[in-house]
Amino acid sequence: MAKTKIAIFGLTGCEGCEFHLLSLDELLLDFFQDFEITNWRLLSKKERADFDVAFIEGAVTTKEQIKLLKDIRETSKIVVVLGACAISGNVFAQLTPEQRKKLAPKIYDKNYKLKAEFLAPVEKFIKVDEKIPGCPPDIEVFKRILEKLKTRKIVSKIKKVAPPDFTEGIEGHGVLKINLKKREAKFVVEESERLVEGLLLGKD
């Protein structure tokens, strides 16, 4: 019997949720025995665009990320948001737009243009099936969701993806580029300021 395929994506945040999963020792070993990981940059796996379940961490901050989320929702049978940033924006949502504008020149060059356009939780843009709260995420909730996934019959959606065939989204400290037509994905590091920039994000 084929294993359920899981993809893990990070939007804008500190990536602590993903690193927290890497520290789970025996639980992580069981995780790999029961599921096939098709996308997870932290494990340096060759990423593919086919998966049944998507775990998403981080807040949404760009239009490109919205497009990525919709593509993920179209492909995935189940979407799970991981951690407080993906659920509510967490500490990144504490600054107002005015505070962000005031602080930006003190951290970056005065002519630096922030990449983030807004801040919103994942659920604002796509339907979410499960939530794992916490910063870092609640491991007991994570375990319960994994048990549900193991016992639940999951059938991959096979749908034609309408143009454009290429999309990208900011993920951690770089950009995840996905070619949906060729079913290929790669991660490109284009900047190193995502963590600090996250602290400057405000609400709509």
Provide a role label for each language-model segment.
Residues 198-199:
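Long, low-complexity intrinsically disordered regions enriched in Ser/Thr, Asp/Glu, Pro/Gly
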